[in-house]
């Protein structure tokens, strides 16, 4: 599908709702903890939605956000106005290859080179 931003699981929330929910939730957490280091964990779809927002992109660019390996780490700093500034995204260098969920899969590589270059 060439329009992942229009996806809505039957009986579930729309991609737009996930995008907005993640934005509001992370914003509330950051505002409640100014100047503190925060660790948050979620599932891939929610993470990609937030990274799309943090990069300053509209939801329609969700396909440009790379998929991440399980336990990948992204670092996002927030300025005084609580605006996100990604430092790095989807770092899985701590994983040995045998522990990587992506090492033996290829479905996620489709367009990965394009998405990686979009962040630079």
Task: Map each language-model feature to its residues.
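Acidic, low-complexity terminal tails and accessory targeting/binding regions
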Residues: 31, 36, 52-120
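Amphipathic, non-transmembrane alpha-helical scaffold segments
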Residues: 15, 19-23, 66
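Short, well-ordered beta-to-alpha junction loops that form the rim of enzyme active sites
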Residues: 22, 41-45, 89
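Short glycine/proline- and acidic residue-enriched helix-loop micro-motifs
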Residues: 1-17, 110-116
């Amino acid at each position: 599908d060439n329009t992942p931003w229009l996806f809505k699981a039957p009986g579930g929330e729309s991609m737009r709702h996930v995008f907005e929910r993640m934005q509001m939730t992370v914003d509330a957490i950051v505002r409640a903890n100014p100047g503190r280091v925060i660790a948050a964990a979620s599932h891939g779809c929610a993470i990609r939605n937030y990274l799309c927002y943090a990069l300053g992109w509209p939801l329609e660019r969700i396909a440009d956000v790379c998929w991440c390996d399980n336990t990948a780490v992204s670092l996002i700093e927030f300025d005084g106005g609580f605006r996100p500034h990604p430092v790095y995204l989807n770092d899985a260098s701590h994983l040995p290859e045998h522990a990587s969920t992506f090492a033996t899969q290829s479905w996620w590589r489709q367009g990965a080179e394009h998405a990686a270059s979009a962040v630079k």
